[in-house]
Amino acid sequence: MVRSDNDTWDLASSVGATATMVAAGRAVVSQDPGGLINDPFAAPLVRAVGIEALTMLADGKFDIEKVLPESAARVRANIDEMAVRTKFFDDYFMDATGRGVGQAVILASGLDSRAYRLPWPDGTVVYEIDQPDVIEFKTRTLADLGAEPTCERRTVSIDLRDDWPAALRAAGFDPSAPTAWCAEGLLIYLPPEAQDKLFDDIHHLSAPGSTVATEFVPALKDFDPEKARQATETLTRMGVDIDMPSLIYHGERHSASDYLETKGWQMDSAARATLFTRYGLPAPGHDDDDPLGEIIYISGTLR
């Protein structure tokens, strides 16, 4: 399905299904007691969505080497990346709130369960923004599991293409207080101008001392749809109906780090291989068939 300005989705289709796929990856890496992360809610959330192949993956019942012998190494590398990515943002939130930031905003929160699994400091308010059906599904599913937030969780049921800043304020957000912003796994699904607007909105809502973290994919300007189609074929063989080329907005766009620095944010960046090494995992080798190429993890503070 080709993206449009007003397209919608649930957690089993379009962009929503990618959130379920990411949660399945978190479920896999959480099976290792000594692993980088522990997300006990990932597998039950994936099961509740009901995509059979992803449920099998989340439950450790999908034989990657048997079903995808020629792609197994890449799939394993992608799962390792989910561990690294999740750890990066977990650490980001704990560092920011540990230094006294009292509110956090998770943009396009999907099946993110940090409001339920991270040890937030007392009094922390976590806002989750996503489409109404996504918010309702996750809230209901976690309630059925008996899960309780480890923070004051406030949901903001709105599409990021609508006036989410107004909805966030209406939910009690305080723009005069420092905020920890997170845009995990989001930018590739935004047109370039929407990415700029997102950061403009974040900046206008941020008090000094606020922090932001996201990933940036420099190669989107040279995006190769054919390589993305190959990735889609791998997903299809797994039994997952996600058409990656139709979901990603590519073309020239501002570097997220550079754009924020022009607004007074002090930014740091780390390449994918740097994070793998930091967290004790073997860095992935260069993959000529990777449709996204390098991924840069960035974070920064508004001075």
Curated annotation (Swiss-Prot):
Keyword line: Methyltransferase, S-adenosyl-L-methionine, Transferase
Entry-linked Pfam families: LCM
GO BP terms: methylation
EC number: 2.1.1.-
Binding site for S-adenosyl-L-methionine: D130, D159, L160
InterPro entries per record: Ppm1/Ppm2/Tcmp (IPR007213), SAM-dependent_MTases_sf (IPR029063), SAM_mthyl_Trfase_ML2640-like (IPR011610)
SUPFAM superfamilies, A to Z: S-adenosyl-L-methionine-dependent methyltransferases
Gene3D superfamilies reported in the protein's UniProt record: Vaccinia Virus protein VP39
GO molecular function, one term: methyltransferase activity
Highest taxon of source: Bacteria
NCBIfam families xrefs: mthyl_TIGR00027
Family, as annotated: Belongs to the UPF0677 family.
Function (record text): Exhibits S-adenosyl-L-methionine-dependent methyltransferase activity.
Entry-linked PANTHER family: S-ADENOSYL-L-METHIONINE-DEPENDENT METHYLTRANSFERASE YKTD-RELATED, S-ADENOSYL-L-METHIONINE-DEPENDENT METHYLTRANSFERASES SUPERFAMILY PROTEIN
The name this protein goes by in its record: Putative S-adenosyl-L-methionine-dependent methyltransferase MSMEG_1479/MSMEI_1443
Organism per entry: Mycolicibacterium smegmatis (strain ATCC 700084 / mc(2)155) (Mycobacterium smegmatis)
